[in-house]
């Protein structure tokens, strides 16, 4: 059996697959191959689309599994680390779940007087 680790960062998604018995990494991949885009719509703001993260996770997992020569049923557990201070709000439907809006990433620098600009739905 194998363990899969996924690091969801603001520049890329990194995925590693480890053989449970030996502790050795048997496959790894990352995506996108160039730094993920970050939109700065105004000074001090930085946004990414959570839908892009999900696409990158799927691509990275497929790449790592291909390199490790394993199938989904060979994965015993998945561990996920995520960029700090992140919250992605989704709807309640598990089939069509999608993020409500682009996500401010950790490198947003909001002065307390600017916090009123954030709308909580």
Locations of the language-model features?
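N-terminal glycine/serine-rich phosphate-binding loop of ATP-dependent small-molecule kinases
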Residues: 1-99, 111
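Adenosine ribonucleotide-centric catalytic and binding domains
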Residues: 101-103
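Glycine-rich phosphate-binding loop plus the immediately following alpha-helix
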Residues: 105-121
């Amino acid at each position: 059996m194998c363990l899969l680790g996924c690091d969801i960062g603001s520049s890329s998604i990194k995925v590693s697959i480890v053989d449970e018995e030996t502790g050795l990494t048997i496959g790894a991949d990352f995506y996108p191959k160039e730094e993920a885009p970050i939109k700065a719509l105004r000074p001090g703001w930085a946004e990414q689309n959570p839908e892009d993260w999900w696409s990158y996770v799927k691509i990275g997992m497929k790449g790592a599994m291909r390199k490790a020569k394993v199938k989904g049923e060979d994965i015993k557990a998945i561990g996920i680390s995520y960029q700090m201070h992140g919250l992605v709000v989704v709807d309640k439907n598990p089939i069509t779940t999608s993020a409500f809006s682009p996500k401010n990433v950790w490198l947003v620098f909001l002065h307390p007087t600017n916090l009123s600009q954030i709308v909580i739905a």
